[in-house]
From Swiss-Prot:
InterPro entries: Ribosomal_uS14, Ribosomal_uS14_bact, Ribosomal_uS14_CS, Ribosomal_uS14_sf. Part of the 30S ribosomal subunit. Contacts proteins S3 and S10. One of its GO terms (cellular component) is small ribosomal subunit. It holds the Pfam family Ribosomal_S14. It comes from Geobacter metallireducens (strain ATCC 53774 / DSM 7210 / GS-15). One of its GO terms (molecular function) is rRNA binding. Keywords: Metal-binding, Ribonucleoprotein, Ribosomal protein, RNA-binding, rRNA-binding, Zinc. SUPFAM superfamilies: Glucocorticoid receptor-like (DNA-binding domain). Zn(2+) binds at C24, C27, C40, C43. Belongs to the universal ribosomal protein uS14 family. Zinc-binding uS14 subfamily. GO terms for biological process: translation. The gene is rpsZ. Its cofactor is Zn(2+). Binds 1 zinc ion per subunit. This is Small ribosomal subunit protein uS14.
Amino acid sequence: MAKTSMIIKAQRGSKFKVREYNRCPLCGRPRAYYRKFDMCRICLRKLASTGQIPGVIKSSW
């Protein structure tokens, strides 16, 4: 319940621009957010490993 209310609160926007923060649209996670992909690290890893994000490959060196 608390997580759902925080997601709705983040979508609403705030009175001041500085208080807004990014959340993952898939899971709602506020931390470890990648702007380039518009998702959190966990969802990014899950989708990249299944090949659903074009251009992202697993690196090996």
